[in-house]
Amino acid sequence: LAVRGAGIPEPVKPKSGLNRTREKQDGFEMSQRLMLTWMTSYPELFGEIAKYISPEDFTKPLYHTVAKMLFEQYETGQLNPARLLNYFTDNEEQKEVAAVFNATIPLETDEERKKALLDVVCRMKEDSIAHRTASLEPTDMQGLMKLMQSKKELEDLKAGKLHLHISFK
């Protein structure tokens, strides 16, 4: 009361860290949503993206399902995102999937697009590796080898040893 503003600092309430975890999760989900948008907005990039990203890299169940269906369509040469909407019967899921397909990526130059796409690929791989590490059985040597390969690939991408060969023309 009378002490406030008298030069005595007010006690600071410690932060719980809950919001930071949620923000991190939101960032990973945004990366997955952006990747789906890239894949449907620029189908000509699909082959290059598929070298680094697979449906297993989508850790949010809804996005994993959508990615799996998109990859199947791509493999048959019939990429049609609108057809996927019929698969989802829940209104909320339909809205979320439609939002992914109708999103815009507000980047001006090809250089900005390439950097953004590389950032999304790296972020998704990081999340995927963390997710798979957390659920890996201690005796799964083959899974461990795949994780190590994924980590090496991610390090190479970040270091510029591997390149996304993409063009937005």
Predicted segment positions?
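A charged alpha-helical hairpin associated with nucleic-acid processing machineries
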Residues: 1-169
